[in-house]
Regions:
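Conserved N-terminal diphosphate/IPP-binding helix and adjacent helical/loop segment
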Residues: 1-107, 163-176, 326-343
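All-alpha helical catalytic cores of prenyl diphosphate-utilizing isoprenoid enzymes
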Residues: 19-36, 45-60, 118-230, 234-240, ...
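Acidic, Mg2+-coordinating active-site segments of isoprenoid diphosphate-utilizing enzymes
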Residues: 63, 90-112, 124, 166-170, ...
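Residue-level recognition of alpha-helical structural elements
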Residues: 71-77, 142-145, 209-212, 293, ...
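Internal, hydrophobic cores of structured domains that mediate oligomerization or house catalytic pockets
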Residues: 82-96, 114-134
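Small-residue hotspots
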Residues: 84, 88, 121, 217-219, ...
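Primarily interfacial, aromatic-capped hydrophobic alpha-helices that serve as membrane anchors
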Residues: 122-144, 255-307
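Short hairpin/turn module used for nucleic-acid contact or packing/dimerization
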Residues: 291-343
Length: 343
């Protein structure tokens, strides 16, 4: 698995990782207090969960908060709330995709995949509110701002949730690749990646019309689109099973070779692919379309990195080249991207 530790040579990313580590400890401490006296017991934070590898996206968001010059007390609050957002999204994805990527570790039975995710949502709701009450007590926010943050915590992820709901139970159409990217994936993932900016924008710590803020938002949105294309490559088999929108499926359907189109049709007709069919590597059956999807995903990520650099992240041309080289290594084995998706 490629590492992103080269970023730790940059002081901004070291500072941002330390901030995220503090957030995780704060989150764990709140969980411990809330679970005290219950029948569910919290386990210690795994050391690996404090690494850059496990918190790559969260660290990126915090680094952007610094670049956008958000005052330290508010930045700390937004980083805490963003971790709650991460927990909600991860748990909801688990329920929608019938999988388990844990963000809270308890002594609940290993087989309890569904309830673990339900419990994460319930517990995170209370942690989120406790973080708000702490900020209110410390006069970091006022009562009206508590109300704003409660509202924005739902509305910021509702666009993505609406798209997930539209696809639940399966879809029968196959939009063109450009429609998948600019409509479906923009709603599902593009806006979701930009959601961490919603709270500071709502409270006036970021001016959405200011040039740097626009670059940050556009960069996050584009980064989300690139990540979703990678997600679609590794999720090809599952999305065929569930009849969900998928960029690679769209490429095959609208632009694929005759052979690739025929293979895709056969997979739909066969139905119910299992894990034994190598779902994470099914893209290899469609080499030409997969190569195009990788190129399109790379293009989106390169565009995002340029935006991040222009808005002030210390990503020089050399750093961006290193970044892309690492990402390309991931792209050559898209099934590995599965392990980065909840970061």
């Amino acid at each position: 698995m490629p590492e992103f530790d080269f970023l730790l040579k940059l002081s901004l990313f070291r500072t941002s990782l330390k901030a995220q580590q503090t957030v995780i400890h704060d989150f764990w401490e709140k969980a411990q207090m809330l679970l005290a006296g219950s029948e569910i017991h919290l386990k210690p934070v795994p050391k690996s969960w404090l690494s850059l590898r496990h918190n790559y996206f969260s660290v990126l968001f915090i680094a952007l908060f610094h670049v956008l010059e958000i005052p330290a007390p508010r930045l700390r609050l937004y980083a805490r709330l963003n971790h709650c957002l991460r927990a909600w999204v991860t748990a909801c994805d688990n329920l929608l995709d019938k999988e388990l990527k844990e963000i809270i570790l308890t002594d609940l039975p290993a087989k309890a995949h569904t309830f673990k995710s339900v419990h994460t949502i319930l517990l995170t709701d209370r942690i989120f509110f406790s973080f708000l009450m702490d900020a209110l007590d410390q006069k970091i926010i006022n009562t009206a701002e508590v109300e704003q943050l409660l509202n924005i915590s739902l509305s910021a992820i509702s666009i993505s949730g609406r798209e997930e709901a539209e696809e639940e139970g399966g879809v029968m159409d196959t939009p063109r690749p450009d429609q998948i990217l600019q409509k479906v994936h923009l709603a599902k993932t593009g806006h979701l990646f930009a959601a961490p900016l919603s709270a500071p924008s709502a409270l006036g710590d970021i001016d959405p019309n200011q040039a740097t803020a626009k670059l940050a938002r556009n960069g996050l949105t584009t980064f989300g689109l690139g990540c979703q294309i990678l997600d679609d490559i590794s999720d090809l088999g599952q999305d065929i099973n569930d009849r969900k929108y998928n960029y690679l499926i769209s490429l095959i359907h609208h632009r694929g070779t005759h052979g690739e189109k025929k293979r895709l049709q056969q997979l739909y007709e066969d139905g119910n692919l299992s894990d034994h069919d190598g779902l994470e590597k099914l893209y290899q059956v469609f080499p030409e379309a997969s190569q195009q999807a990788l190129a399109d995903g790379t293009r989106q990520l390169k565009k995002a990195l340029r935006s991040f650099s222009e808005c002030g992240l210390p990503l020089s041309s050399l750093n961006r080249d290193i970044f892309i080289k690492i990402l390309v290594t991931v792209f050559r084995h898209p099934e590995r991207f599965y392990h980065l998706r909840d970061r």
